[in-house]
Regions:
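Surface-exposed, charge/polar-rich loops and edge strands
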Residues: 1-413
Length: 413
C-alpha cells in the first residue's frame, strides 16, 4: 500500500489568493508569464526569468537564485504563510459543469522507487535535472504533482463531508475554471485518511507531473545519502501531490499537426492512407472522432474520417491497440517518415482544450500541412497500462483543468 502524510502547507492568505495563484510553470512561455504576472504572482517564483531581460537564458544561475530570493521575499512579506499544523486539504476544480475533488497530501519517495507510484510516460533527463535544481535550491515542492487512485468509498465520503463546509478559497480563474480549497485539521479525520491510504490504496498513478515526481524522488535520494542518521521519516522523503479518485477524471484528446507530407502530393498521401484506413471525406465542417480507432484529419481545407482497418494493428497488445500507436506506426512513421515524436521538428502537439478549430487554423495559416485528431484515451486504459509496467507513447494524455500553482507549497524542512 502507499504511504502518505499530512503537511503544514505554505500558502497565501485568502484575501490575496487570486493575486498569488498562477497557472503551472509549463503552461506558459516566458513572454506569456511576463504579461500575466502581477506583483504577488507565484510566476515570479516558478518562472523567475520574467524578472530579467528576455535575452537572459532560462537556466542561467541568476535565474535560479532569483527564484530563491523571491520565495523568501514572498514569505517575509506575508504573501505566503505556513500553517501551524500538519493538515490534509481538499482541492476542487470545476470545468464546464464537471467538478473533481482531490486530496492534497504528501506521498513518499520510496513508493516511486518501488513502483507503487506508477508512471505511464518516460521522462527526459534534462527536464528532470531542471525540476531537481528547483526543488533542491528552494528546499520545497513549489508545485504539486497530479495523481489518480482507484476509488475508495470511505475516502470519497470524507471528502464529500468536508466540502459541505465553507471553503477557505473560492475563485474563478482566467479560463473560467472554478477552484475551491478546504483545510482538514481535526486529528481524528487526519488519522483516518492516513490509515485508509496506507491500508487500502495500493497505488498512485501519475496523471500529470512525471518530471516533478522523478525530480522529487532524486532529491530525496540525494538528501538521504548525505544524512548518516536517515530514518525514512524526514520531510525530504515526502513530496506534495493532489490525488483524485480515477472515476472523477477525464482525459482530453491530444492531437498532432505535421509540417509537410514527406515529399508526397495530397493525392499520393490519401492513396497511401487507404492501404490501412477507410478514408471518408467529411467536408469543411469540423469532424470529431467519436470512437476508438477512428481519426479525424484536416488536409487542404477539408476534414476526413480515417477508420483503421482490422488486422492493421495489434489488438492484443495494450500499447499497440492505442490510437496514438496506430497513428504513429501507420501514418507518422510509415508514410510521413517521423521516427521520433520527441525530437522531430516536423511535428507538434495540440492539447484538446484548444479545440479542433486550432488544428484547422494552423493548417490554413500555412504553418502546417496536415492535422490529426484522436479519440481520447480512457482512465481505464491508462491504469491498465501502468499496472502492467508499460509506457504510453509521448503526448498521449492531456488532463484538464491543470492544477493551479500557489495554493499550497510543501517545505522539505
Amino acid at each position: 500500500m502507499v504511504r502518505v502524510k499530512p503537511f503544514a502547507a505554505i500558502r497565501p492568505p485568502k484575501d490575496i489568493v487570486t493575486e498569488v495563484a498562477a497557472p503551472p510553470y509549463d503552461v506558459l512561455n516566458s513572454a506569456e508569464a511576463r504579461e500575466m504576472a502581477g506583483e504577488k504572482s507565484l510566476l515570479h517564483i516558478t518562472k523567475p526569468e520574467i524578472d530579467f531581460e528576455p535575452m537572459l537564458e532560462d537556466h542561467d544561475p541568476l535565474v535560479y537564485a532569483k527564484a530563491v530570493e523571491n520565495f523568501k521575499a514572498w514569505q517575509a512579506k506575508g504573501w505566503l504563510k505556513r500553517d501551524v499544523k500538519e493538515c490534509y486539504y481538499v482541492y476542487a476544480q470545476t470545468m464546464e459543469g464537471r467538478t473533481q475533488y482531490g486530496l492534497v497530501l504528501c506521498a513518499h519517495t520510496d513508493d516511486y522507487a518501488t513502483g507503487k507510484i506508477k508512471k505511464h510516460e518516460l521522462t527526459r533527463k534534462d527536464k528532470e535535472d531542471d525540476r531537481m535544481v528547483h526543488v533542491r535550491i528552494q528546499n520545497a515542492n513549489i508545485e504539486p504533482v497530479f495523481f489518480a487512485y482507484k476509488d475508495n468509498d470511505i475516502l470519497n465520503k470524507i471528502v464529500a463531508q468536508t466540502v459541505t463546509r465553507e471553503p477557505e478559497y473560492n475563485f474563478i480563474d482566467e479560463n473560467n475554471f472554478g477552484h475551491k480549497f478546504w483545510v482538514i485539521d481535526d486529528d481524528k479525520t487526519i488519522d483516518q485518511i492516513t490509515r485508509l491510504f496506507c491500508g487500502d490504496v495500493d497505488a498512485f498513478y501519475v496523471a500529470d507531473g512525471h518530471h516533478r515526481t522523478a525530480a522529487a524522488a532524486r532529491v530525496g535520494a540525494e538528501k538521504r545519502s548525505l544524512n548518516p542518521n536517515h530514518t525514512g521519516d524526514e520531510e525530504y522523503n515526502f513530496f506534495m501531490a493532489v490525488c483524485f479518485p480515477e472515476s472523477q477524471l477525464k482525459i482530453l484528446d491530444y492531437n498532432r499537426v505535421v509540417k509537410d507530407l514527406n515529399g508526397l502530393s495530397s493525392e499520393e498521401f490519401l492513396a497511401a492512407l487507404k492501404k490501412d484506413f477507410t478514408v471518408k471525406e467529411m467536408g469543411a465542417e469540423i469532424y470529431h472522432p467519436d470512437h476508438l480507432h477512428n481519426f479525424s484529419m484536416y488536409l487542404d481545407g477539408k476534414w476526413y474520417s480515417l477508420e483503421a482497418l482490422p488486422g492493421r494493428y495489434d489488438d492484443k497488445d495494450p500499447i499497440g491497440v492505442l490510437d496514438v500507436t496506430i497513428l504513429s506506426n501507420l501514418v507518422l512513421d510509415a508514410i510521413l517518415g517521423i521516427k521520433d515524436l520527441r525530437t522531430d521538428k516536423r511535428i507538434d502537439f495540440v492539447g484538446g482544450i484548444r479545440g479542433l478549430g486550432e488544428l484547422s487554423r494552423r493548417v490554413d495559416s500555412g504553418e502546417m500541412k496536415v492535422a490529426f485528431a484522436l479519440y481520447p484515451v480512457s482512465m481505464k486504459q491508462l491504469i491498465d497500462i501502468a499496472d502492467t509496467g508499460n509506457i504510453m507513447p509521448p503526448k498521449t494524455t492531456w488532463f484538464e483543468p491543470k492544477l493551479r500553482s500557489g495554493l499550497f507549497i510543501h517545505s522539505l524542512d
